[in-house]
Amino acid sequence: MPAAVRELWRMLRPGGRLVLTTWGPNFFEPANAVFWDTIQAHAPELHKGVNPWDRISDPDSLRAMLADGGIRACDISTELYEHPIASPEAWWNTLLGSGYRGTLDQLSIPARERVREANLKFVRDAHIVAVEANVLYAVAKKSTA
């Protein structure tokens, strides 16, 4: 990530702004953990212990990564947000419309159906009506000198 930031910063004109967003802490919780637990149970080879954005999901780690990429001064803000889940099926559609689809598409049809049923059951039984969708925003302005 620092190398990509370094290249973006290099390409930015003097006086320009670089704006980055990343998922904040607890992304898609409380349902995220259940999703990955069911993946581990049905396709352990696809289980990810850490999501890539977890490395930069708080202001301090995002600031450190940007500094590693050559950005010394930036403003970082956090927006706490909940993504509404109208029904268990809406949660499944959220998964299908997210980066998690890459994992789901690698499952066999029977495994995918078991993961789907486990997730729908959790959302239904736990009465989940929203998941966390917190975001961090970083804005850095390149000096004109």
What are these regions (language model features)?
Residues 2-3, 9-86, 102:
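Conserved catalytic/acceptor-binding region of the Class I
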